[in-house]
């Protein structure tokens, strides 16, 4: 089943002579359960493409279909709700809410979804166990290591049962050993729950683990490699 | 609940900034409570000094009498009026008076002044004449008793027990008439106009002197609730009024006090306005700093599905807690100050309004329930209103730009 479908996706920044095409005529499809990495040099358009797929930015041309719904022209609350229910995000700098505990950070998105508190708490316990953070739920982000914080971010991304998880350089701030452990957790989730992951990365560990590599150069797909 | 907890905890991310903002807002509220208490205290002091000294809260006179104090403009038969006044449950007391200009003479000197004929028992309830007696006794009802002011007594070189001859014009014939009195008491109001120009005798003696048996010039009214006399009295006594009689509340009797009260209300409004600006700037500054510090975080929570409305609510709940904390702190400080000065008073010095000394030279702040309820609510509401702009600003943060800026 296709989870993501993009056709002739383009995004430009600036005007006139300063106009830059960050993404140019990008078309691809991603099936459920894929572990895909979008790779390329800095400035190749990886993050912009990830933002377009995640509904954080709208394309100037082309279309994006996510879980059967066209999102390119969604606006406001419709788009917020769609992101909340269908997309999980993992960012480079963890981006947990510092005043909430690990458990509360995970709970936050379920609160937005209107899930009742006992149900939220039960799910949080389950997911903390899944990402290997049992017993650390009460800790604030500042009291967790970088790897643990990123695991909380993974847990937050998957707890809303999204159709896809988008991860922008998730291992960039981690040492290689911690980064490897985190990737193993994500790979396990991919295997066990058939969760679809799309990474934007430079990290060779992710490239090695990915089942598909989309090479970007100057905003266009240079090569689409199935492993 | 998590939402409320998040807002509460956000408030203490930068404790020093929050406390400084709280201090600014709470100082504003404390000043507002204290200033309001002082203004209300001054209002009460002014009204009390003016109405309780001699004038009363309201007066009934013959139409035109107050213009020139023409003695022949008197109420010949006050029976109907007194009947109505007796039925009026709003009244706590009233007193009948006769007053006329005249010559006040002793064996050594003479001076012009105002002769008041009063009913001693009734008068006790509506004026401070009895309390102002510094020597001798208040009127007991005996026909030749007279009370004289300290300054006038010095001028006439008289003391207790000395004789005083009052000369006035008969109200009907305009012929001069005289009578002899003995000084039974010397009073000191502390107001020059009273102490050097007024004498008080019994009502019947004054009526006899002026040839107006049973007639009176003035009825002074005192109400259970002093605010009653601020209302339109002529409407409430409509059936009493005819072309001959007028009823005037203290605002009408002392228009200058009314003007002063308007200035005090304007003063409260100005203080409120200044506080509005101060609090607004403080809250806007604090919230914007807090939002700018968290711009990446706002980008993230927008990205994971928080709606604009939820962001607005989050900032407003934070502002509400900020206002609530500040209101609590300001209320305690403001009430403590106001309570202290309501007991001990603020020294005013010798301040006179319309020739009347204000109280005992101290201003006592007035505590009122609305200061505890409405002023803190005003401050919380003000904080919330001020937070609307930063809240909308936060809700408009574009996730991609916020994420790029932070990286």
What are these regions (language model features)?
Chain B
Residues 97-98, 113-118, 132-204:
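Hydrophobic secondary-structure segments that place a key small or acidic residue at a functional site
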Residues 1-33, 43, 48, 52, ...:
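N-terminal Sec/SRP start-transfer signal
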Residues 170-268:
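Mechanotransmission and gating elements of multispan inner-membrane complexes involved in transport
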Residues 15-42, 262-297, 320-329, 378-385:
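Hydrophobic alpha-helical transmembrane segments of multi-pass inner-membrane transport and secretion
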Residues 328-375, 388:
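Short helix-loop junctions at transmembrane helix boundaries
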Residues 288, 297-342, 382:
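Transmembrane alpha-helical interface segments in multi-pass membrane proteins
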Residues 367-407:
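C-terminal membrane-exit region of the final transmembrane helix in multipass inner-membrane proteins
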Residues 33-114, 137-142:
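Hydrophobic, regular-secondary-structure patches
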């Amino acid at each position: 089943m296709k989870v993501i479908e993009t056709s002739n996706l383009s995004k430009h920044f600036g005007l006139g002579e300063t106009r830059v095409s960050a993404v140019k005529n990008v078309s691809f499809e991603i099936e459920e359960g894929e572990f895909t990495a979008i790779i390329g040099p800095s400035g190749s358009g990886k993050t912009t493409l990830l933002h377009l797929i995640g509904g954080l930015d709208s394309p100037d041309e082309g279309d994006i279909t996510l879980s059967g719904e066209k999102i390119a022209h969604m606006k406001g609350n419709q788009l917020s709700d769609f992101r909340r229910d269908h997309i999980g995000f993992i960012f480079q700098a963890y981006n947990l809410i510092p005043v909430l505990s690990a458990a509360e950070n995970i709970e936050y998105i379920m609160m937005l979804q209107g899930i009742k508190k006992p149900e939220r708490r039960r799910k949080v316990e389950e997911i903390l166990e899944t990402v290997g953070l049992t017993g650390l739920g009460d800790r604030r982000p500042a009291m967790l290591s970088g790897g643990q914080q990123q695991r909380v971010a993974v847990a937050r991304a998957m707890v809303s049962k999204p159709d896809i998880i988008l991860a922008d350089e998730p291992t960039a701030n981690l040492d290689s050993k911690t980064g490897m452990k985190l990737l193993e957790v994500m790979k396990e989730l991919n295997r066990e729950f058939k969760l679809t992951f799309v990474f934007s990365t430079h990290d060779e560990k992710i490239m090695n683990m990915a089942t598909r590599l989309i090479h970007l150069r100057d905003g266009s797909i240079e090569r689409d490699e199935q492993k | 609940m998590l939402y409320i907890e998040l807002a509460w905890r956000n408030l203490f991310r930068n404790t020093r900034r929050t406390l400084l903002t709280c201090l600014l807002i709470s100082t504003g509220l404390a000043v507002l409570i204290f200033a309001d208490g002082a203004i209300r205290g001054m209002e009460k002091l002014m009204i009390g000094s003016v109405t309780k000294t001699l004038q009363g809260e309201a007066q009934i006179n013959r139409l035109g009498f107050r213009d020139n104090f023409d003695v022949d403009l008197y109420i010949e038969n006050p029976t109907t009026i007194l009947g109505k006044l007796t039925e009026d449950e709003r009244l706590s007391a009233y007193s009948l008076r006769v007053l006329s200009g005249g010559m006040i003479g002793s064996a050594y000197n003479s001076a012009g002044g105002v002769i008041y004929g009063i009913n001693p028992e009734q008068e006790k309830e509506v004026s401070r004449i009895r309390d102002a007696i510094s020597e001798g006794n208040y009127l007991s009802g005996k026909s030749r008793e007279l009370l004289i002011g300290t300054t006038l007594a010095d001028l006439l070189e008289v003391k207790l027990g000395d004789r005083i001859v009052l000369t006035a014009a008969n109200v009907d014939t305009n012929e001069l008439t005289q009578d002899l009195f003995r000084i039974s008491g010397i009073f000191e109001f502390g107001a020059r106009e009273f102490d050097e120009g007024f004498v008080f005798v019994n009502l019947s003696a004054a009526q006899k002197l002026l040839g107006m048996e049973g007639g009176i010039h003035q009825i002074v009214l005192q109400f259970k609730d002093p605010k009653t006399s601020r209302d339109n009295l002529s409407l409430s006594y409509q059936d009493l009024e005819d072309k001959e009689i007028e009823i005037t509340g203290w605002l009408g009797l002392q228009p200058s006090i009314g003007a002063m009260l308007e200035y005090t209300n304007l003063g409260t409004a100005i203080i409120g306005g200044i506080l509005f600006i101060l609090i607004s700037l403080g809250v806007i500054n604090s919230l914007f700093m807090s939002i700018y510090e968290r711009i990446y975080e706002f980008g993230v929570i927008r990205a994971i599905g928080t709606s604009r409305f939820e962001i607005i609510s989050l900032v407003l709940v934070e502002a509400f807690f900020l206002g609530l904390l500040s209101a609590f702190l300001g209320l305690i400080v403001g009430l403590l100050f106001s309570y202290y000065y309501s007991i001990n008073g603020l020294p005013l010095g010798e301040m006179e309004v319309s020739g009347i000394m204000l109280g005992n030279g101290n201003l006592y702040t007035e505590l009122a329930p609305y200061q505890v309820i409405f002023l803190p609510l005003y401050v919380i509401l003000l904080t919330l209103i001020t937070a609307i702009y930063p809240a909308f600003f936060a809700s408009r943060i574009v996730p991609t730009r916020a994420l790029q800026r932070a990286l």
